[in-house]
Amino acid sequence: LGCYINPVHPDPVIRRAEINRFKEHLRYARQFGAPMVATETGALTTFQAQDPIHYEAIGWDTLRATVEELAEEAEKWGVFLGLEGVCTHTLSTPDKMRRILDEVPSSCIGVVLDPCNFIGTAAHLQDQIVDDSFRLFGDRIILAHLKDIYQDGEKAYHGKAGSGVFHTEAFLRKLQVYKPMIDVSLEDIKDLEVNETVALLKKLAPITQ
């Protein structure tokens, strides 16, 4: 299941409502046959207006407190709390993902790896970012998201997997090494593109068939 809340919302009342909504999803996840409930982690700049110097530290402490609470709830119900990093969010790099896993040492926390979210506009660094992800938390990945990066001049945007500048074949082969048979969800894809995209992905990485 996905319950994409803002775990670092600056308004504590709204943040509490978001946390409670996520906990409800954790309680009922097994009824839907879902082993996990996933979320992203809120904007890195959430507290910048409040404290231009220490805003990242404030956001981190807020995120850690939320993750601790949600991990405890996940443990009660035997499901995973899935954390997805994004280059503009509190978990903005593979190193930060590793840090939260170390600071909240719960076996019920897993990683939803969307490499394009970590890469953002830094396509030239994608191999390093992907390799860092597998090196730092490859054993904790519980789901992969797959899309592609397309460039229009200086702008980058996401679209269907396999036809952009993301090194899809290399990623799928690394994923097979670290997490064979893992589920992969296609994102940023239109209905009429599904069959064509799946066929292309099977051609790019036959090992995933």
Residue spans for each PLM region:
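Conserved radical SAM core fold
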Residues: 6-7, 44-47, 118-119, 150-152
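Active-site acidic/histidine proton-transfer and metal-coordination neighborhood
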Residues: 7-111
